[in-house]
Amino acid sequence: MSKLARLEREEIMECQVMWEPDSKKDTQMDRFRAAVGTACGLALGNYNDLYHWSVRSYMDFWAEFWKFSGIVYSRMYDEVVDTSKGIADVPEWFRGSRLNYAENLLRHKENDRVALYVAREGREEIVKVTFEELRQQVALFAAAMRKMGVKKGDRVVGYLPNSAHAVEAMLAAASIGAIWSSTSPDFGVNGVLDRFSQIQPKLIFSVEAVVYNGKEHGHLEKLQRVVKGLPDLQRVVLIPYVLPREKIDISKIPNSVFLDDFLASGTGAQAPQLEFEQLPFSHPLFIMFSSGTTGAPKCMVHSAGGTLIQHLKEHMLHGNMTSSDILLYYTTVGWMMWNWMVSALATGASLVLYDGSPLVPTPNVLWDLVDRIGITILGTGAKWLSVLEEKDMKPVETHNLHTLHTILSTGSPLKAQSYEYVYRCIKSSVLLGSISGGTDIISCFMGQNSSIPVYKGEIQARNLGMAVEAWDEEGKAVWGASGELVCTKPIPCQPTHFWNDENGSKYRKAYFSKFPGVWAHGDYCRINPKTGGIIMLGRSDGTLNPNGVRFGSSEIYNIVEAFDEVEDSLCVPQYNRDGEERVVLFLKMASGHTFQPDLVKRIRDAIRLGLSARHVPSLILETRGIPYTLNGKKVEVAVKQVMAGRTVEHRGAFSNPETLDLYRDIPELQDF
């Protein structure tokens, strides 16, 4: 057995339980398992039994969940799915059914219950929107859209902050059968046009300014340039957000109108009534975009039915979410977690929409909201938890948090030390759910599960209906060893197609070129055969393979970033003309610390001890900055391109594109 394999095996044997479910609590997962057992005549003793049945008999699983979820529809399906087709065939799901996504999100009739809590940086007031008020607003938006000629299949877009109006505009578009897409105000002009110019929207919603990190950021100049680059736009709706209407000049923006005038255009003598177009399950709902860090963003079309049923599965079964829950996911409208979060309305839960920095005026801003509103589920990026730990924040000592039962984390792998931090310094009884999937499926392959334990450093389990495995280079499943994350059977949440990809070649290249007929997601992971948990090891396009040893960059990060002297790090491969590979580790030093040979030696020793000698980088260098996407993900592939002397054309997806130039013409890299 190799040293690497032995280390992985030892790690598996050292599983540490951080949280266990209450055996007396009856969850929706338990009720669903019992319902399936009765309906199908099965003895399903635990989650593992249910999971394996759900992927083995995936057609029956989705049919049973359709019933359990209470999806609102006007016509029942004729067929769940054609099981003779594989995932690469992109089979049609629930053929013959008719439904509407927005109708399902607005189905709960407790009119006076709060649907949306709206909180903003720098404002004390929390605005409440009830379900009845939300329905009324969606009706107004939809009537105005219809008045201007928006119809099924038209694209409606938002260049918006995380706000009630973003939710209302999206639901209105969905009620008509228009396709919604959105980016957040932190995207630059090029980043927005790289996305929206591909889908030719008819209508755009935006704002005049936003507040972030204690500063007001004007938005009109960017919006004007975006509008100029979208010739098919018929209407630009400006929502006064920071300033009152009378202080905003939109005269330079063609076809522009203020929100109140736009909404008034759709009203007659009586308030408009909500109408929900009844559409096929596969009707397009969202166009989502890939990061665009190495080329033009891919435009992924997600269906209304597939998105709805997948999100309901994750919220109801895996999250045990009910109408008594209040969910805050810290996200922008440019990240798929916003779409995922909004779908929670279909459970009757309330949403908290927070717009602003999670660290201003203090790093406690989200914890303050938890106590003030009574939030039960808090979602964030793994990076935020690391930042809190670095700042030695201890909410367990400063906040009540008595309503909080779940913390969710995604965006990047959650470090093992973050598990310890959460249970020691935040709340010992909380379910810490690391979840992982992607924009490509607008959901999760794996994630939180209220019916099984949480183990340190592991995502709890593969999600129901998701036939996920880790494969080696030969296309064989590996257990307890590192491999490519694949999905072997059809899922309703895969994109129906890519926009502007008539022959499907881009789609096939994106997911099915590595293993024909099997979805390769682009992530590197390890599945623990003892617990069923998963450890994410980073993007497989950033996989390191020096001297034939394959490993993920996050394995290095987990060791390096435990050093107080290191604020951040980036681990990338470099190739010479002969195709040989060496690993280069860049360190961004923490404030007050300098890059020293002694630190380099201690890091090398720690990697050698924690992993193996073959994991030790060939070079460890200092850097002043590390590039991130606007969604907070490290950008390894683009740095690899710059190191190789290539140009990265599409910089609009980066939060700090200037840092890419730090990796060009580095003297220490020239002799390889």
From Swiss-Prot:
GO terms for biological process, alphabetical: fatty acid metabolic process
Keywords from the named record: ATP-binding, Cytoplasm, Fatty acid metabolism, Ligase, Lipid metabolism, Nucleotide-binding
One Pfam family linked to the record: AMP-binding
InterPro entries: Acac_CoA_synth, ACAS_N, AMP-bd_C_sf, AMP-binding_CS, AMP-dep_synth/lig_dom, ANL_N_sf
Keyword ATP-binding: yes
Residues spanning the membrane: none
GO cellular component terms given for this protein: cytosol
Reaction(s) catalysed by this chain's protein: acetoacetate + ATP + CoA = acetoacetyl-CoA + AMP + diphosphate
GO molecular function: acetoacetate-CoA ligase activity; ATP binding
Localization in the cell: Cytoplasm, Cytosol
Top-level EC class as recorded in UniProt: ligase
EC number per UniProt: 6.2.1.16
Signal peptide: none
Family affiliation: Belongs to the ATP-dependent AMP-binding enzyme family.
PANTHER family listed in its UniProt record: ACETOACETYL-COA SYNTHETASE (PTHR42921:SF1)
Protein task: Converts acetoacetate to acetoacetyl-CoA in the cytosol. Ketone body-utilizing enzyme, responsible for the synthesis of cholesterol and fatty acids.
Protein name (Swiss-Prot/TrEMBL): Acetoacetyl-CoA synthetase
Organism: Mus musculus (Mouse)
